[in-house]
Amino acid sequence: MKCAVAILLVCLTLQQAAYGFLYNEEVKTEFQRRKQSLEEAGESLKQMGQNLQDNMQRSLAEGQEALQKHIKNLQQSMLSQKEALRNRGEALRETVGERLESMQNQGKDWMKKMQEGRETLQKKLGEQVETFNQTFQAGRLAIAKKVLEGSETMRKTIQNTTQSLQDKAEKVQETAGKNVEALKLIARKNALSLKESLDTLRENSVEENMQALRNFLPSQSEAMDLPKEKLQELMASIQNNTGLFQESWGQEKEKMKEMLRGLKRKVGERTEDMKRKMKARKEELEAEFQSRGDEAVQTVMEIRNVTIKHLREAGKKIKEIEEKIASLLPNSCLDFLRSKALKMGVKIVVQDLKSVFRMGWLRVPETFEKEEEIAPSTEEDGSEELEADSYDSKVGGESPISQRTEERQGAEERSRLRRRRAAVLRRMFGQWSRKS
């Protein structure tokens, strides 16, 4: 049994060894066959790679030649479009220059008319003021003449009254002197008569003296009352004359005051009337100047809006040309486009295109900056700024500025141009890089 098993095991081992030998032979044969096929495939692949490399070099040369032709065509088209834009810009500049020159001439005419109107108004005002001054001087001279006449009349009246009063005083003094002499005579007579009476009284009796005294007293009192009555009449006449003089002087003063009040009232009415007329004329001239100024501002606004519209259309066409150039260029030319020479060429072209539309009086740099910002509110902001600028420079033209302000504005404009050119180049190469 054990021998059978051992024999069986030996047989199995021999069978497996025979199978292994046969399998190794087949593997070697398959390996040789596959190695040969791989060598044949490598040869064919090497041949195909050589053919592919030749084809690629030939296609690359053809592509470079086509690219150069395409670039030449693009340069020619850009030059033609640049020339067309330059011609259009020149025509637009000539048109705008003519409109600006006509507006400047019209503004000069309006300024000349305004100056003539101002001079005419000043001349009329000067004539009216001169007339008013002459009228006032004439009135003042008339018042002074009236016052002098009144004062002369018053002086003569006072002089006459004083003379009459002096005459009356002299008469009164003379009368008083005569009365004193008469009184002295009467006193002497009375003294003599009194002496005689005393002598008589000494000689006569008491009853006779009393009777004589009763007869003497009434006649003596009458003689003493006579000068008193004359003096009272003289004083009454003096008082009456003084009252009449004061009354006439008061009437003359009232007349002169009334005349002065009337003259002042007339002068005030004439002055107020003249002021009203001057104010009305001034308002009429201001309204006329305002209407003419509004018309000028409206014309300037229309011209500026039309110019800005043309400039925006030109900017849009420039953008379209840039986009068209970017879309036509193939992706394999990106490195060539980013080279320094082409950048300088594009920069020069953009600078030439934008220098065509540069006009300082229309503030075109601000307009290009607004066009570069792709936003919905760009046109509204630009129109509002233009309107604000137009209403800042109303009737009369632009005022002269100093040299320092002009230099600062020139420097700011140059810096804005540099920033704008850099932004345009960045946008162009950014579009080309995104498309590639």
Curated annotation (Swiss-Prot):
Enumerate the subcellular locations listed in this protein's record, separating them with semicolons: Secreted
Span list, region Disordered: 371-419
Q: Which residues form a coiled coil?
A: 25-87, 154-207, 247-329
**Gene3D superfamilies given in the database record:** Apolipoprotein (1.20.120.20)
Signal sequence interval, chain numbering: 1-20
Endoplasmic reticulum listed as a keyword: no
Identify the GO cellular component terms for this protein. Answer: extracellular region
Tissue spec. comment: Component of the acid-insoluble organic matrix of the aragonitic skeleton (at protein level).
| Annotated Acidic residues bias | 371-390
For bias type Basic and acidic residues, the affected ranges are 404-415
Query: Main site of residence?
Result: secreted
Keywords assigned:
Coiled coil, Secreted, Signal
What is the name listed in the Swiss-Prot or TrEMBL entry for this protein? Uncharacterized skeletal organic matrix protein 6
